[in-house]
Curated annotation (Swiss-Prot):
Its EC number is 7.6.2.-. GO terms for molecular function: ATP binding; ATP hydrolysis activity; transmembrane transporter activity. Its main location: membrane. It comes from Zymomonas mobilis subsp. mobilis (strain ATCC 10988 / DSM 424 / LMG 404 / NCIMB 8938 / NRRL B-806 / ZM1). This is Lipoprotein-releasing system ATP-binding protein LolD. The lineage of its organism: Bacteria, Pseudomonadati, Pseudomonadota, Alphaproteobacteria, Sphingomonadales. Belongs to the ABC transporter superfamily. Lipoprotein translocase (TC 3.A.1.125) family. Gene3D superfamilies: P-loop containing nucleotide triphosphate hydrolases. One of its GO terms (cellular component) is plasma membrane. It is found in: Cell inner membrane.
């Protein structure tokens, strides 16, 4: 079997569909999505609230079941994997950034970024060294020992970015990553996020309703009513 690093396409999605039951009715959320994202590519998933962006990210992030179609990550067909194998894919190859930071409140900024590395099997020294590098790169060198409650919103989200990149994921999934920040702070966080993603050579899919933000990515696809309707 080829190494995951040998695959140029980080993710390939074919005919992805998702429907929910609402009483006697079936509500179609995703309607046959096809998408390929290549190694190192940063893709904007543009669409209004309710378009299906979060549902799509949950599907390709292996956070939900109940989808039909095919999801292939680094050459592995997800439908053929058991729960343990899917967890390993999430842990080793995917990173997540959300609108709200979801940091562990009883852990410092440094510890929040070390933790996913320790879970992956890194030594404490390795995890600490890489966490230092990421947080320093995000201009948080004076905040390493601070707890989330002691950080500003922008600082919290930068820690969340560092945590998402801690295991050098092949693919980062970000759902409105600056949606809870004011415009000026959001621009700073996004700039630093994109800089680090590119430096690590990760691919990324960033869901947003903001065209100005989307234009900063390598490619834009538009999701509307569960369908990809534009690409540019």
């Amino acid at each position: 079997m080829n190494s995951p690093l040998s695959y140029n396409n980080v993710i390939e999605v074919t005919d992805l569909q998702r429907a929910f039951k609402q009483g006697e009715h079936e509500i179609q959320i995703l309607r046959g999505i096809d998408l390929i994202v290549r190694r190192g590519e940063i893709l904007a998933l543009l669409g209004p609230s309710g378009a299906g962006k979060s549902t799509f990210l949950q599907a390709i992030g292996l956070l939900e079941n109940g989808f039909t179609g095919s999801i292939n990550i680094l050459g592995q067909e997800i439908g053929s994997l058991n729960d343990k194998e899917r967890t390993a894919i999430r842990r080793d190859h995917l990173g997540f950034v959300y609108q709200f930071h979801h940091l562990l409140p009883d852990f410092s900024a440094l510890e929040n970024v070390m933790l996913p590395q320790l879970i992956q099997g890194k030594s404490s020294h390795q995890a600490k060294e890489h966490a230092h590098f990421l947080l320093n790169s995000l201009k948080l060198e004076e905040r390493l020992k601070h707890y989330p409650s002691q950080l500003s919103g922008g600082e919290q989200q930068r820690v969340a970015v560092a945590r998402a990149l801690a295991n050098r994921p092949a693919l980062v999934l970000a759902d409105e990553p600056t949606g809870n920040l004011d415009e000026a702070t959001g621009d700073i966080v996004l700039h630093e996020f994109l800089r680090l993603v590119r430096r690590q050579g990760s691919a990324a899919i960033i869901a947003t309703h903001n065209m100005a933000m989307a234009r900063k990515m390598d490619r834009i696809v538009t999701l509307h009513d569960g369908r990809l309707i534009e690409e540019y």
